[in-house]
Amino acid sequence: MSGQKLTAANLVSAIDSLKKNVNYNYVNSSNTHTIQIVHVEKPEGPIKIKRGDTETSISKQAIWRLADALSTGEPVNVDRVFGASYNFRSALEALLAHTPEIYWCKLQRIQPGLNKSEVVEGHKHIIWLPDRPHEKGVMKEYETDVVISEIPSNNVVYDALSLPSTHSEIDIDVKRRHVQIQIALSAIGFQLGFRTWIARNDQGISYGDKKIADLDGIVQKIESEKLISSFDGAVQAAMNIDCIWFRNGKLMPAVMEVEHSTGVRSGLARMKQLKDLLPPYANTRWVIVAPDEDRDKVFKEANVPMFKNLDTQYFPYSAVEELYSLCIRRKLTNKAVNEEFLDCFMEKCVM
């Protein structure tokens, strides 16, 4: 059972099974306030709760963030998942701890010192144990001798972007995130010895003090890539693909479309159009890169019969930024890891 993952829909369904308008305690016994469930929007949230006289919502995105952190039998510090700025985190933790498959636990923690480390009482965690459900509506502590050594969280920092002023404010936020992920993908590619094609329309965007087209490892003309230009219609089909990795002029490790939920099908269609114009290159991944909360949408669309031959892989934003951070911090290169290393961060979609 180890390694099983949860989705936002799983967490929402579990919380929805609890009684509404009943007072639920926090995991931290020093917090004497209580929480009530007001309304649960299925399948993935939001969840409206009441604390005292105040109503607030736990967003779909927040629920997905915690779901993505939970695996069978692995303790999770909810405070670290969200950071101190999220005031709903303890409420979400508490509600889940009242569901049968989630326990709370307190781990011993390794406290580093100047000359030696010592084991001290640690912070509260939650742990998902689907094989040993407890009574619904009550919290149950899981007794464990596990000792944890907490490593600092790693932030991903992007330079300023200068986007065209032809979008609405909401569109600009979506486009900014889209381009940030393209930047991360190109940086990953550069570290691993790939050259990266970024969609023609995005190459003129300013990132820091450079155009994207001038960043390290960027392919400025798709026409120069023989793997594409040797086949009728392929250059035009590749022109607006968000990201393509090339290696040694002989390999194409990945073709990637960066999409939000409304664009998943169109991204698959663009990749299929390109794939149908090319020979069956070995070890090319056809990848949808999308927010973590859009996983179900990606899987559903990838299994539509017309797209099944893409054998699509899903590369969530969180995994992109985890790999980006790792590449930058540890200076990973293709001498240290092979292309199969990428598959650790992606998930096969086709059933």
From Swiss-Prot:
EC number: 3.1.21.4
Organism superkingdom: Bacteria
EC category name: hydrolase
A GO BP annotation: DNA restriction-modification system
Gene Ontology MF terms: type II site-specific deoxyribonuclease activity
Name of the protein: Type II restriction enzyme NmeDI
Originating species: Neisseria meningitidis serogroup C
Signal peptide: none
Catalytic activity as recorded in UniProt: Endonucleolytic cleavage of DNA to give specific double-stranded fragments with terminal 5'-phosphates
Keywords: Endonuclease, Hydrolase, Nuclease, Restriction system
Role according to the record: A P subtype restriction enzyme that recognizes the double-stranded sequence 5'-N(12)RCCGGYN(12)-3' and cleaves on both sides of the recognition sequence.
